[in-house]
């Protein structure tokens, strides 16, 4: 149960900031109606699945062969595999969003340091210092301020200060550079577009996985679990009758999981409709548009070189005759 709790926390982190309202409803459906029911109820229902699968024969190996024919993969294992695969796109989205947030913090810190480097120490602490009045005092004050900048914060690091010096350094507010603001806004916009594009892509992949597992469940098990299963598979000598434990309970559980998968598919389609099919097309074609824009910018920045026209020579004129 501890592994499922970790998965629930990761899914909650995936939809905490970037998901829509439909995505949060889908998370509730996945967590409550899938993870909790499979982890708590499913293990109890399918605990004696193979041991209680009894066939009316004493032939060695016949029970195991018929069980493998009746259930190529166990219901509970199929649903666990389905939950893991369906949650994989959301986990990939968590990794991508955390990575982008870390990069954004690094850019923000680098912007602060660039702003501090642009302003000289004289403009921060005054033109002539507080006690020197000349070039020597200015140099001492510059050295003092340069030593005081620690992680982008101005601190008074000198322990042996004179009584005439103030306890705190008077610092004026730094005004960010306009080019830095434009660069920061552009990078933030690109980051938001990238996260939105990746979110749409993971919703598309998640819906495709839901539909694939729904179809696979239908072809493997159908909509009911029979109580009596007839088997003539080797090494059975003749056709034998096998009995499945708790067929009605398993049928109800199977139909319930069909309904949950159908609800998840409908919610995924509703979320895609909410995000907009036009945005989805842009997200799918985002890489091509990005390459095209980079190509146009490069062609615009390159200087146009005029090719000199030497005209036709006599030999070239004769060549066209």
From Swiss-Prot:
Q: Where is this region: Disordered?
A: 118-141
Where does this polypeptide localize?
Answer: Cell membrane; Cell junction, Gap junction
* Family, as annotated: Belongs to the connexin family. Delta-type subfamily.
The chain's Extracellular topological domains, given as residue ranges, are: 43-75, 221-252
- What are the record keywords, sorted? Cell junction, Cell membrane, Gap junction, Membrane, Transmembrane, Transmembrane helix
- Matching Gene3D superfamilies: Gap junction channel protein cysteine-rich domain
Protein name per the record: Gap junction delta-2 protein
Q: Which residues cross the membrane?
A: 20-42, 76-98, 198-220, 253-275
Query: What is the membrane topology here?
Result: Multi-pass membrane protein
Pfam families with a match to the protein in the record: Connexin
Q: Which organism is it from?
A: Homo sapiens (Human)
Summarizing the function annotation, the protein's role is: One gap junction consists of a cluster of closely packed pairs of transmembrane channels, the connexons, through which materials of low MW diffuse from one cell to a neighboring cell.
Q: Which GO terms describe its biological process?
A: cell-cell signaling; chemical synaptic transmission; neuronal action potential; visual perception
């Amino acid at each position: 149960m501890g592994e499922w709790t970790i998965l629930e926390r990761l899914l909650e982190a995936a939809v905490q900031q970037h998901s829509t309202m439909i995505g949060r409803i889908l998370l509730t459906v996945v967590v409550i109606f899938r993870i909790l029911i499979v982890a708590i109820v499913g293990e109890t229902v399918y605990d004696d699945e193979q041991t209680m699968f009894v066939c009316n024969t004493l032939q060695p190996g016949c029970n195991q062969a018929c069980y493998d024919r009746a259930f190529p993969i166990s219901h509970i294992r199929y649903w666990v595999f389905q939950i893991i695969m369906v949650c994989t796109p959301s986990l990939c989205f968590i990794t991508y969003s955390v990575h982008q947030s870390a990069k954004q913090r690094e850019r923000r810190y680098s912007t602060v340091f660039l702003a501090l480097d642009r302003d000289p120490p004289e403009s921060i602490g005054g033109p002539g210092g507080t006690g020197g009045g000349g070039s020597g005092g200015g140099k001492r004050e510059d050295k003092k301020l340069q030593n005081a900048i620690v992680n982008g914060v101005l601190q008074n690091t000198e322990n042996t200060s004179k009584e005439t010096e103030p306890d705190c350094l008077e610092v004026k507010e730094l005004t960010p550079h306009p080019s830095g603001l434009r660069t920061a806004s552009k990078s933030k916009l690109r980051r938001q577009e990238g996260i939105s594009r990746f979110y749409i892509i993971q919703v598309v992949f998640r819906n495709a996985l839901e539909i694939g597992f729904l179809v696979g469940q239908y072809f493997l098990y159908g909509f009911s679990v029979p109580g009596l299963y007839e088997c003539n598979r080797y090494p059975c000598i003749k056709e034998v009758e096998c009995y499945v434990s708790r067929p009605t309970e398993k049928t109800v559980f199977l139909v319930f999981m069909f309904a949950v998968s159908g609800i998840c598919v409908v919610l995924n389609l509703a979320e895609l409709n909410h995000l907009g099919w036009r945005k989805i097309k842009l997200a799918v074609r985002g890489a091509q548009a990005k390459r095209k824009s980079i190509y146009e910018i490069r062609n615009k920045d390159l200087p146009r070189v005029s090719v000199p026209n030497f005209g036709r020579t006599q030999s070239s004129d004769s060549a066209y005759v």
